[in-house]
Amino acid sequence: MSTVIYASPIFGPIHSRRLGVSLGVNLMPADGKICTFDCLYCECGFNADFRPKLKRPTKEEVKVALAKVLQQRHGNHEPLDVITFAGNGEPTAHPDFKAIIEDTIDLRNHFFPEAKVSVLSNATMVYKPEVREALMMVDNNIQKIDTVDMEYIRRVDRPQQPSYDVKDVINN
């Protein structure tokens, strides 16, 4: 399986079968992966193989980069169906996730009010109130839970926190 490390903070657009023309927002460093899981099937590879040297993009860097791309696409009359938070790891792990979502919604409303905002997440951070609040703001809150079998999760998803329990995620 080939490994994909996405540009940061903005990549694409790509054409998604599920979402349409999707502009990606990667809240992780452009040179590596930071994730709360280390899934055997991850397209970004294993955490240990792609430890970043760069820092995560700041809230302001994300806002400026997203505004630039949205303004350019709007000016060129290029379509956009969705702004999707995904990339090199778990987007909700960014310390400014909620504020970045708020900025994104403001920019979307200005340039592409018909576009959706989506988040692809492994659901490991939903226990945080500010993450839950941010996820409630987006149009497509796409949370991934592979199974409720903790043995399978430990073997395949490989949570980075030993205390991880899928039941806690479900109850939140």
Which residue ranges define each predicted feature?
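Auxiliary Fe-S-binding modules of radical SAM enzymes
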Residues: 1-20, 64
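Canonical Radical SAM [4Fe-4S] cluster-binding loop centered on the CxxxCxxC motif
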Residues: 19-60
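Short, well-ordered amphipathic alpha-helices
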Residues: 25, 64-71, 100-107
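Short strand->helix junction
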Residues: 32, 90-91
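Short, basic/glycine-rich phosphate-binding loops at helix/coil junctions
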Residues: 42-43, 80-82, 148-153
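Conserved alpha-helical substructure of the radical SAM core
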Residues: 46-82
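Short glycine-rich or small-residue beta-strand-to-loop segments that form or flank ligand, phosphate
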Residues: 83-88
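Conserved AdoMet/S-adenosylmethionine-binding subsite of the radical SAM
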Residues: 92-172
